[in-house]
């Protein structure tokens, strides 16, 4: 089970991130999570949105270079050790975490972790077998 993540290369200039958010706002797309990794000249924006296909289309239409990737989203208890348990299950498979980020839904309710693995199928199988709650495009907003 995976979710669709929108990734964009972004010039490291004032107003560029706002332009992405404004474009999505004007088209009625809701952002669940945003991650920005930057260098001196450019950044990579990673988004989870409620309607990824519409987001892709409107961002491309606005001239942004858009890439859609399947990533693994996990819901876990908001408690010490939850992330460690997830990573231990993945470690057993030999899959590698290429990157990850997290966001909270409601304090004390659950935490959401988003992973890009070098072997998604292997990681998903191990996490599912361990009873870890995987999310899809519909449940990421639930």
Feature roles, as predicted:
Residues 1-142:
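A conserved regulatory-domain signal marking ACT and ACT-like small-molecule sensing domains
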């Amino acid at each position: 089970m995976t979710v669709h993540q929108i990734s964009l290369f972004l010039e490291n200039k004032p107003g560029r991130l706002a332009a992405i958010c404004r474009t999505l706002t004007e088209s009625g797309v809701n952002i669940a999570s945003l991650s920005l990794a930057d260098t001196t000249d450019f950044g990579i924006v990673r988004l989870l949105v409620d309607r990824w296909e519409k987001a892709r289309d409107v961002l491309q239409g606005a001239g942004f270079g858009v890439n859609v990737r399947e990533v693994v989203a996990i819901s876990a208890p908001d408690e010490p050790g939850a992330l460690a348990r997830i990573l231990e299950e993945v470690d057993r498979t030999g899959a590698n975490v290429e990157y990850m980020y997290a966001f909270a839904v409601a304090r004390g309710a659950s935490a959401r972790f988003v992973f890009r693995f070098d072997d998604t199928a292997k990681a998903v199988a191990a996490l599912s077998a361990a009873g870890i709650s995987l999310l899809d495009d519909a449940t990421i907003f639930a």
